């Protein structure tokens, strides 16, 4: 029986490149140590990823009756989301395009083997 629990945050307003830096730090850690690491990180992505990790932990507890001490982060994936395209006025009547990127963050927690 598969005891993995998943949580997904779609359309997070942070670039995937910045979110992947934080995701790489917590990949493979136990659930409790991952939340502690994210709590004290100063990056914006840490706050967003912490919410998703806590949601995945809550899903594991409620849906499968798992204990938080036995959980670890099996996979954490940051995919590209929708891009908002904006234009900024430049000199001599020109304009340049600004791309505001978003991310889809997926966290899967499961029992530590």
Swiss-Prot record:
It comes from Xylella fastidiosa (strain M12). This is Large ribosomal subunit protein uL22. One of its GO terms (cellular component) is cytosolic large ribosomal subunit. Keywords: Ribonucleoprotein, Ribosomal protein, RNA-binding, rRNA-binding. GO terms for biological process: translation. It holds the Pfam family Ribosomal_L22. NCBIfam families: rplV_bact. It comes from the Bacteria. The gene is rplV. GO terms for molecular function: rRNA binding; structural constituent of ribosome. Part of the 50S ribosomal subunit. Belongs to the universal ribosomal protein uL22 family. This protein binds specifically to 23S rRNA; its binding is stimulated by other ribosomal proteins, e.g. L4, L17, and L20. It is important during the early stages of 50S assembly. It makes multiple contacts with different domains of the 23S rRNA in the assembled 50S subunit and ribosome.
